[in-house]
């Protein structure tokens, strides 16, 4: 005896359901006859009749996907509806709405609604399908009346003159992007060793944003097994700065603190971001295109580079002392992007707040006219041993020089080269490795007449490592 095959469910699209309703209204056909015509069950036709008003509303809205057969309600229907409302407003204003922009807005709406929701690409695809949303050419309706002229003296965001009087020094931020030859040593560097760094701080110097590094490698092997949220700085797999994502995070952070802040940017960057919606807590203030004043004082940028190079030379000297016969260039070739990320974070922390504040005042980028203390804070760390002040100063400003040909290839090497830390996977340390390392480090301190203050810092580190090992 053969088992009868299970009858396959035939779902109707929205367009077909409207045809069903039209047939029932305009003809004398019964629900059973209509069901046979569309090859569905009679109860399915009955459900269509019960949902008649909702189906007609979806059809008339013009936003529903008319070929969609099943409309499963989203778990976050409130976010769905709010995002769709924002989308229609954005399109009416002729904004170029992109996928990342919708993801950012969905997350922002979820935070406002108090929902623990992280939108994904898959969720966005389903949301677009549910609401018949596409990113084709814009069709903006012309207003039925001429726009009302702005009040006297009021200009658009792109035309705003640089005015800081409405902000306190704590709420005025400046940021700068700069190239950095992250593993260069005096007299030896290559262009392929470059990363792009984004620095941002407020004019008082009391708040520094997380350093962002952009590099050419999409997934450096030195990041294998690393949790990005545990790092003191961020890495972006491109030399270009991801302004949209960075500004969105900055805006969220300021919103959580209930602050309205000003961000000084180069006119070129502000022009590229023209029409960017969704910044509610960060006001972009462009510097004049003809201005030679950078949005983050050059003395602050130079101080960061000086501390970076000073710390890098210290690290390389330690490597040389461990490996006899290793040249400075050979030691530098082993520096990875991950090393550079940590050194950059430490160097940025070393830039003193007094220097930042005085530099903003001198450049006219901070509100108020009262100068800081007459005591001038040095922007340079102590000159490393083996270099004169002039040599170290030239090393700090290395990015302005032309790289020597051939050096880049030697420093990068190949994946098979021995000692190439960038091209090889290192085994992940275990909890036992971490505890043994603590014991080794303490023993080394004990044998080298370490100061009590350093032991206090070590105890804090030891306590935290032991806590993490117990998780």
From Swiss-Prot:
GO terms for molecular function: DNA binding. Residues 31-51, 100-130 bind DNA. Residues 67-137 form the HTH CENPB-type domain. The keyword ATP-binding does not apply. Keywords: DNA-binding, Nucleus. GO terms for cellular component: nucleus. PROSITE patterns: HTH_CENPB, HTH_PSQ. It is found in: Nucleus. Residues 3-55 form the HTH psq-type domain. Residues 167-360 form the DDE-1 domain. Belongs to the tigger transposable element derived protein family. This is Tigger transposable element-derived protein 3. It comes from Homo sapiens (Human). The lineage of its organism: Eukaryota, Metazoa, Chordata, Craniata, Vertebrata. The gene is TIGD3.
